[in-house]
């Protein structure tokens, strides 16, 4: 098993990379199956030792590695399932689903759901609306499976129903005043749930753990090697990814049975190297990047990514390829990372410096890097040692 992990909205182990942060101490699911011990070596299920658990939730892969019991990990999976039942906007019967189908009427919800909606609205306000929980109608237009950009008219019509100010939450109710508008907590829920998983493990006496919920990474204590976790931040290499996507789509288009393997062999893919490796203990690492989901519009040849600007209804056009937020809570990292990309490097650096307990690593589309924010976090994670990175003060 590797000694390195990565982050991006990542996997787990001592070292990780990011569209999510991830850890090199974490094996792939297939390698984990190959490494299963024989029945005579299996420890007692309640014995505290390093254990790993992969599971699917929130429409993404989740991973936990911890010095814990099997029961501890069972509790983690159960907790995530509970939050999915509450917060999913696509699962019939969830609180968010009920709010979106209430046709403008105030809806009774779990107090925790209402509290998270209020917290999400706080980040909407703090970011001047660059983080917006009412983007669902717009996001549906940018169908990454159809690989076709929506018309200007469709975007304009969807924008009429976008605006976080249409949402209100009390202690146990939520209302969206525009019946055509919808909310989704996808931009903050995984961070919030990662924090709750952290709290659960702490309550169960777990001190050392790596938590990755679809790339929202939280690390606790030390890795199995007795030192802080290493988290690798993915290098966006935006232009190479654009070319790769173009070649892949051309290969798919000319093959009657799917991907033309011969064309893909010509891509010359190299083993991915992280843009940097952070040293982390008791910290959250959340990365948003324009390389996470994108498609080539066959009609125009343009590449569109998934980070939408609520002001224009289109993929943002800032100079940033990724933003990695280092913070004490994953809720904060999730709530800030996407907005920072839309802001662009200069504005994002100024914004993160205003936050008291967070720092950020910015990678621009041309590959240059900058760091800004809480100096103690930057020094603790060795982010200030990133080769060539500008330290914005």
Language model features with spans:
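Mature catalytic core of soluble alpha/beta enzymes
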Residues: 1-393
């Amino acid at each position: 098993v590797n000694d390195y992990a990565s982050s991006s909205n990542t996997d787990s182990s001592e070292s990780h990379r990011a569209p999510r942060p991830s850890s090199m101490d974490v094996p792939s699911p297939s390698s984990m199956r190959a490494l299963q011990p024989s029945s005579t070596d299996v420890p007692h299920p309640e014995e505290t030792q390093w254990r790993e658990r992969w599971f699917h939730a929130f429409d993404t892969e989740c991973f936990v590695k911890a010095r814990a019991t099997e029961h501890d990990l069972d509790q983690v999976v159960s907790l995530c399932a509970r939050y999915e039942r509450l917060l999913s906007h696509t699962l019939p019967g969830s609180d968010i689903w009920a709010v979106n189908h209430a046709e403008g009427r105030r809806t009774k919800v779990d107090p925790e759901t209402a509290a998270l909606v209020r917290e999400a609205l706080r980040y909407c306000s703090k970011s001047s609306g660059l983080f917006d929980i009412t983007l669902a109608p717009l996001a549906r237009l940018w169908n990454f499976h159809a690989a076709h950009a929506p018309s200007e008219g469709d975007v304009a019509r969807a924008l009429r129903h976008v605006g976080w100010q249409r949402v209100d939450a009390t202690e146990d109710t939520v209302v969206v005043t525009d019946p055509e508008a919808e909310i989704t907590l996808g931009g903050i829920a995984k961070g919030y749930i990662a924090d709750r998983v952290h709290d659960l493990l702490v309550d169960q006496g777990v001190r050392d753990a790596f938590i990755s919920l679809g790339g929202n990474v939280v690390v606790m204590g030390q890795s199995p090697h007795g030192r802080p976790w290493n988290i690798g931040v993915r290098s966006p290499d935006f232009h190479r990814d654009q070319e790769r996507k173009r070649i892949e789509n051309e290969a798919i288009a000319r093959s009657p049975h799917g991907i033309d393997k011969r064309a893909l062999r010509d891509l010359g893919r190299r083993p991915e190297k992280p843009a940097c490796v952070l040293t982390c203990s008791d910290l959250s690492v959340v990365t948003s990047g324009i390389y996470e989901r994108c498609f080539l519009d066959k009609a125009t040849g343009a590449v569109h990514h998934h980070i939408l600007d609520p002001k224009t209804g289109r993929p943002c056009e800032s100079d940033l390829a990724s933003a990695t937020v280092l913070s004490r809570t994953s809720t904060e990292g999730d709530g800030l990372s996407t907005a920072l990309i839309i802001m662009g490097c200069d504005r994002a650096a100024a914004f993160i410096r205003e936050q008291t307990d967070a720092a950020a690593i910015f990678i621009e589309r041309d590959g240059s890097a900058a760091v800004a924010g809480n100096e103690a976090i930057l020094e603790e994670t060795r982010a200030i040692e990133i080769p060539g990175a500008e330290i914005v003060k």
